[in-house]
Amino acid sequence: MYSLIRKALFSMEAETAHYFSIQALKLMGKLPFSLCSTTLNPVEVMGLKFKNPIGLAAGADKNGEAIDGFAKLGFGFIEVGTVTPLAQDGNNKPRQFRILEAEGIINRNGFNNQGVDVLVENVKKASYDGILGINIGKNATTPIENALDDYQICLHKVYSYADYITVNISSPNTHNLRALQYGEALDHLLAELKTEQAKLAKKFNQYKPLVLKIAPDLTNEEIVSIADSLIRHQMDGVIAGNTTLSRENIAGFNHAHQQGGLSGKPLHTLSTKLISTLAKELKGKIPIIGSGGVHSIDSGQQKIDAGAHLLQLYSAMIYQGPTLIQELAKKIILR
């Protein structure tokens, strides 16, 4: 069945195909039944109870338009966004490119989204009752020295509607954003956001975990430094990781020269190495959500064995269809 759908989608430019997929999922979300049952393989992470450890990665549903549709595909949790305080168009099109030979995707979207207020309204309208993460970022026009303001605005607005909030400082498509991953800049950001989290937890009488999403393009020394900051600031989780700027695994393939972040199967080895190094430093103190290149039972299990507590995918679903979600949920063996 999906092979026919894929053939139709792959006849379109990548971003057009994504648009039609979101529209179809919006319609699917209105159906009184699910096309796929949600496999129960429960796990508790960050104080949250997940139906299974397989989640939708951020980037698939930036505005939270199709939450109920994605829920019918069997995910154990869903992460929407990245969302910014103000709506923005992102970078010029075309900005998404399939690397067919390697089952990868390069994007330079640049946080295109309709703004945090629109996302919140969409979340409020959704009937999904599973774990929902909301991924927050900064506007392209906001100077990097004022980035904290954007994260605080988004944190305040989404806090009541998310089960956990992800702070995205690792997209390669927003100028200078990755600079927030290092040293004093990271310490300042985390300290201020944890202070806000404490205030919001008291205000709403509910603690919502705060997660950091980091890049796979880090040296061992940088990973050690980030892990130290995560522990000192008592972050609740970390997503390892975002898209990569490396083209090592797709050299010579069509579109490999395009600028942007690479996701999908070619990212698997790099992201798994990131998880492994991070896990050694965190020593179980902070849970890891493994993201980047999950494309099979074996690749997912490798990430769990490296130290991940949960998994996220998106690109593999484009290439293989939603059956991979149930297969992973049934067969992944948690540590």
From Swiss-Prot:
Its main location: membrane. It is a peripheral membrane protein. FMN binds at residues 58-62, 82, 135, 168, 213, 241, 264, 293, 314-315. Gene3D superfamilies: Aldolase class I. It catalyses: (S)-dihydroorotate + a quinone = orotate + a quinol. It holds the Pfam family DHO_dh. This is Dihydroorotate dehydrogenase (quinone). It comes from Haemophilus ducreyi (strain 35000HP / ATCC 700724). The lineage of its organism: Bacteria, Pseudomonadati, Pseudomonadota, Gammaproteobacteria, Pasteurellales.
